[in-house]
Amino acid sequence: MADLEKINKIKVAEHIVECFGGIKNIKNIDKDLTRIKILVDSNSLVKRDDLTKNDNIIGTIKSNELTEVVINFEIIEDVYNKILYMMNEQKQ
């Protein structure tokens, strides 16, 4: 069961990255208890409507230059860390 949960968290992270136009479009990422806050190079690449097609994503909030992804608090830490890992891999 643990492996299935891990795979699900990875899929959520990959879904978020895809909906934000790919890892190259993500400039910065931050989080709080229920939201992953993402700053992108190009907002035109962000597919907000597609984000909520994943059951773990509750909604999105657009504020200034950031888009906040409201996510299941039980998995936010792992999803955030996976996106950070993907960003670091891209830089290498």
Swiss-Prot record:
Keywords attached to this entry: Cytoplasm, Phosphoprotein, Phosphotransferase system, Transferase
Alphabetized GO MF terms: protein-N(PI)-phosphohistidine-sugar phosphotransferase activity
Chief site of localization: cytoplasm
Compartment(s) where it occurs, according to its Swiss-Prot or TrEMBL record: Cytoplasm
SUPFAM superfamilies in the record: Glucose permease domain IIB (SSF55604)
Domain PTS EIIB type-1: from-to ranges: 10-92
E.C. number: 2.7.1.-
InterPro entries, sorted: Glu_permease_IIB (IPR036878), PTS_IIB_1 (IPR001996)
GO (cellular component) term, any one: cytoplasm
Example GO BP: phosphoenolpyruvate-dependent sugar phosphotransferase system
Entry keyword annotation includes Transferase: yes
Entry-linked Gene3D superfamilies: Glucose permease domain IIB
Function description: The phosphoenolpyruvate-dependent sugar phosphotransferase system (PTS), a major carbohydrate active -transport system, catalyzes the phosphorylation of incoming sugar substrates concomitant with their translocation across the cell membrane.
Domain notes: The EIIB domain is phosphorylated by phospho-EIIA on a cysteinyl or histidyl residue, depending on the transported sugar. Then, it transfers the phosphoryl group to the sugar substrate concomitantly with the sugar uptake processed by the EIIC domain.
Protein name: Putative phosphotransferase enzyme IIB component BB_0367
Organism listed in the record: Borreliella burgdorferi (strain ATCC 35210 / DSM 4680 / CIP 102532 / B31) (Borrelia burgdorferi)
